[in-house]
Amino acid sequence: MLSTISIRGAREHNLKNVSIDIPRNKLVVMTGLSGSGKSSLAFDTIYAEGQRRYVESLSAYARQFLEMMQKPDVDHIEGLSPAISIEQKTTSKNPRSTVATVTEIYDYMRLLWARVGIPYSPATGLPITAQTVSQMVDRVMALPEGSRLHLLAPVVRGRKGEYRKEMAEWQKAGFSRLRIDGEYYLIEEAPKIDKKRKHDIEVVVDRLVIKEGLETRLAQSLETALKLAGGIAISEPADEGSFEPMLFSEHFSCPVSGFTIPEIEPRLFSFNAPQGACPACDGLGEKPYFDVRLIVPNESLSLAKGALMPWARSTPPSPYYMQILSSLARYYDFSLETPWKKLPEKIQNVILYGSEGEVIPLRFSEGNQIYEVEKAFEGVIRNLERRLVTTDSESIREDIGRYQSAAPCEVCHGARLRPEALAVLIDHHNISDVTKMTVKPALEFFRQLPEKLTEAQNQIAERILKEIIERLGFLDNVGLDYLSLDRSSGTLSGGESQRIRLASQIGSGLSGVLYVLDEPSIGLHQRDNDRLLETLKRLRDLGNSVLVVEHDEDAIRLADYVVDMGPGAGVMGGKVIAAGSPQDIIDCPDSLTGAYLSGRREIAVPDKRRKGNGKKLTIKGATANNLQNVTASIPLGTFTCVTGVSGSGKSSLILDTLYTAAARELNGARLISGDYKSISGLEHLDKVIDIDQSPIGRTPRSNPATYTGAFTAIREWFAKLPEAQARGYKAGRFSFNVKGGRCEACQGDGVKKIEMHFLPDVYVTCDVCHGARYNRETQEVKFKGQSIADVLNMTVDQAAEFFEAVPSIRDKMAMLARVGLGYIKVGQQATTLSGGEAQRVKLAKELSKRATGRTLYILDEPTTGLHFEDVRKLLEVLNALVDQGNSIVVIEHNLDVIKTADWLIDLGPEGGTGGGQIIAAGTPEKVAETEGSYTGHYLKRMLQPK
């Protein structure tokens, strides 16, 4: 077998005909400037080809269910294994996906509760035992005389298949009727059922009317049904709603309450299967409701000023709604100018929930006409509820949904499962009790479980427990011990979700695989980094090739082999500058990475720390998530860094509490903040901006030029050119989103999508405009010999130079270059930008606005995806914002950023329930001397003179 992955002539994106041999079964780190071609080589070439070859080897039927990768632009690659990529982007937003389901821990837990759990009656608290036929007969005979019922044998429950053969056998045995998926049929008239879908089939054993002397026949029919369905029978009312259906089981039933569990199988504990999901919330554990805090986000506003957000969306507010409110004000005698919070509770309730049948004269005017209608007032919330149910429009449904929050389901109280599943206990815990635990307590629960089980139970549980304990151990090892097992995947950060998938990959125990990882150290404190690196080494030692795109210094130093890409970014990158051991990189004079590793270049500690403008922003009594009544002060006019181990409460304090509270007050945002007692100092600010890593646009039509507003200036500039004016072209002519100037063959996309079925969709360059997006006439308008299509194809650096004489465009381009994005194309599709790049495009947009010196900027891990040199440039930009009088709060683990901050707030001491306290606050020097601060421990050596 080949000992290397041999790549020849890789030209994907900006790669310059790269040829390299990468050792197999080693830990290989790819590093280099942001945009230098690391991901193009690791993901778009090596992973894409490995995955493509594997999928291509499958049958055409299997291929249609798998995403096919495009063939990368490379001459040839040898020595590839099946490839698995673990990226940050693929966090599932599915509300049914949890930490336990993603890691497969929940699958093993379901098996454990099904095989070892003991059902207890909710009524008596005693274990449930088998039911006798006599007890079943007594329960049916207790129905009112004359009740008509069907006695059913559930022979198929939630299984796929056609069941033709079985139907013939049932008919042969003397049965004439079936119920298939809730509908009754004669067996000979039963429809052909779809073998690819799950079905419920019950045989009708008997049809009865309750009367005296029926006991013998009923007992015989019950015995037949139980025998046919493996110990289960159903009594179903023939007249709908006359009585509740009864489920009988020879196995588990409470003699007092009649509470019955049909079967204890793993699917009973699945909240994604109808057999296990709570019927009230369909297994989601929560139900949406209209939240008054979202409907009236700012209680200081009056009704006239738009306190009711759903009715104040338009400017000016809709006259129809204002006339309704005026009628209510006349009838109930209150003023529309009174702030919402000062209105009596009765008035607030009438406005929100309606007049409860009380008829109110509602006066409307249309032009010169005035008319009055007397009717009960529906109420804002009732109006939204009705519209949500009756509308067919997805956009209206989405718009109304913005006023909803989720509350725990009233039936299962957030447990997601039906009562039968929650009645099954192991060591006095149902399955939901354990999923509510965080990783560490859950690990402890399963480790001590064998002592609580009988010898027979231990024989069954041994292998299941081994799998659960191993997987929980991996989560603990990659620094995720603070996560609860029922935590929704959608609430995890990119770094957390990547490390969870990493833990499940190690759990799978595969070998001979190529793993490609994208910055697994994101969001990880230096303390946990060593454990992550041990995990990567373990993955390698299983016999896998581990390829990691990473900027972390420890990871680079620990690697078996390092590939340094460069020398610049974008068109200036795409070459391998150095490849070899970490020492080889350090010794290479051309390697920027080597220069930082060796100390030839460094991010310097500032000579002095800013003291700020003397004002401060203080939040008191914050208790969101795991925060323990935290009070924090941020000096304004400074660069503040919030630090702490993963899960210590940084995001809860800054994003969930401080930002949401400030955004509601300063920006009028419709957000719900975490609980806190008070916030002071907002009067010193005029706005708060959260620059996060969410995409700048979700369609290929969105790009850096459209997002920053530069595209409007570019279109206006082209419209002013003599040729454009001679032809009568306005700025709209130069848009690729509307008819007129765009190429109609591809509708301004530049490419056409061809669906290939069993193969990946192919995007072919439009044969009319050849990818330019515009029609020929529009492209004939040129500035310095370049059309607008040529401008969109330029890099930001080239465009800044090209429009040197046009300040409105040049300044926006220069700002993008300043945040280190000089290499991206002006018209690059937003969907192709990484999270870090999207964040910096947002930063550039904010920087290009006129500075007020009273803005609070909040950034969450802005160094994601950044090389040492990129971090240095970013710090220059952030410090320039602070020098203008603004305040910056950054959540960060990167010690190069932390050491340059003016003020630190360190949370901890641990993650999850062990965190949520401020361990230290002050200058980096002060925090470095604080006992018990993990950040201080690592910071100390960074502050020592080299």
From Swiss-Prot:
Gene Ontology annotations for the cellular component aspect, listed alphabetically: cytoplasm; excinuclease repair complex
HAMAP family named among the record's database cross-references: UvrA (MF_00205)
Gene: uvrA
Zinc finger (C4-type): 743-769
Record note on quaternary structure: Forms a heterotetramer with UvrB during the search for lesions.
Protein name: UvrABC system protein A
Disulfide pattern: none
Family of the protein in this entry: Belongs to the ABC transporter superfamily. UvrA family.
Domain spans labelled ABC transporter: 311-592, 612-940
GO biological process: nucleotide-excision repair; SOS response
